[in-house]
Amino acid sequence: MVYVSWSAAALLCASFFSTVVLAQSAKDLYGTWSAKSNQVFTGPGFYNPADELLIEPSLPGISYSFTEDGFFEMATYRVSGNPRNLACPSAVMTFQHGKYEILANGTLILRPFEVDGRQLVSEPCVDKGVSTYLRYSQVETFQRFAVELDEYHGKHALHLFQFDGSPVQPLYLAYRPPLMLPTITLNPTDHAGATATAGPGHRKRSLGELVRAGLQDKHKTTAVRNPSLFNAAFYWWCSAGVIAAGTVLFFMV
């Protein structure tokens, strides 16, 4: 039987709770985080503010970036299947950036610059190849968040929990410092309700006008891709060597 002293148990509990507390700070959020697909990142590779172009990633995913002084950026590319017609999936690309706030209870609130958000909605079997491009502004509230070291993936993971407590898919640290566009209003207008074009309401543009595959017009950045903390191949070969050595010693004894 293994006995654990009260002091050791208290130390473990203190370590656990200190991790949770430390996770609720701007320092822990700092960087660019991306979903498991590792294909969607914030920054100029997703949205070109000069031409107001959303650039389609190779796979769906989500990405958030945070600075230590209260700015954020969001890039999402979601694809939904059509149960009635599998050949007619819908896709939505969304860009937002602005300021964030961490409340005393750990709640994370993202408040975008209203005039800068963009969204592209594509329903090829409905819109006949002409996607809808419009301004987008939506405040996001996360009940809480936590940052931890995911030993399986060898990366730091960001866990976000929506306002109702339901978890968002884990995001993994990809760049630090973050890969972001300038943290200012990129497309100022006279009023927040103005559209991306000169005409009233939102205008429909062809998909080819608005989405450019690949990473185009990528500006210079100081962001550095965050490598995995562990080399899977190295540890695999080390494990294999230990097993082999153990087998030899077993038969020699």
Swiss-Prot record:
It comes from the Eukaryota. Coiled coil: none annotated. Keywords: Endoplasmic reticulum, Glycoprotein, Membrane, Signal, Transmembrane, Transmembrane helix. It holds the Pfam family Rot1. It is found in: Endoplasmic reticulum membrane. The keyword Transcription does not apply. One of its GO terms (biological process) is 'de novo' protein folding. It is a single-pass type I membrane protein. GO terms for cellular component: endoplasmic reticulum membrane. Residues 1-23 form the signal peptide. Glycans are attached at N105. The chain crosses the membrane at residues 233-253. GO terms for molecular function: unfolded protein binding. Its main location: endoplasmic reticulum. Residues 24-232 are lumenal. Required for normal levels of the cell wall 1,6-beta-glucan. Involved in a protein folding machinery chaperoning proteins acting in various physiological processes including cell wall synthesis and lysis of autophagic bodies. Belongs to the ROT1 family. This is Protein ROT1.
